[in-house]
Amino acid sequence: KRLLNNTTPDTDLLYDMLLEAKEYGCEYVVMEVSSHALDKNRVFGLEFDEVAFTNLTQDHLDYHKTLENYANAKRKLFEKTRGEKVAIINKDDPHHEKFMLNENKNITIGKNDADVLIKNYSLSHLHTKIQFSYEDKIYDTQINMVGSYNVYNYLTALMLVHKLGFS
């Protein structure tokens, strides 16, 4: 067990952790890479098979100063993919176009004109029911999380796993 001070550890510790995971037989790593880490090159040398963008908020403006700087830091993750790789993008976020790079296989999530189309969702105090379509099929599901942002988080995670080949 390690206690980490940052969402994304410093480069040396991160590489140590990845090597240790590989030694234990780990085939996949799912990690959050913070905008601070991208700005400070903590993931230097790593390439990602899949990346995701859910939203851009005012959260880290104390560090980045402007939304433009914040978006540019996050965009670095989308530039660190190997070849044409999967990029899951929340099309309903007003900044989504900044992350839609031609060299990536962009898959959009949204309420209008998206690859993963959110048809409907309803929130209760215990769960969220979601109806969405993907590749001409309609799906109904329920998650034990509330908040409209969790609709996007769930569908993003679902698509990342699906694109890795899991059903």
Write out the residue ranges for each language-model feature:
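Short beta->alpha connector loops
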Residues: 34-37, 93-94
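Short hydrophobic/charged patches on amphipathic alpha-helices used for structural packing
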Residues: 18-19, 40, 75
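Conserved helix/coil segment N-terminal to the catalytic DExD/H
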Residues: 37-44
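Alpha-helix initiation/capping motif
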Residues: 3, 7-10, 41, 63-66, ...
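Conserved nucleotide-sensing/catalytic segment adjacent to the nucleotide-binding pocket
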Residues: 2-34
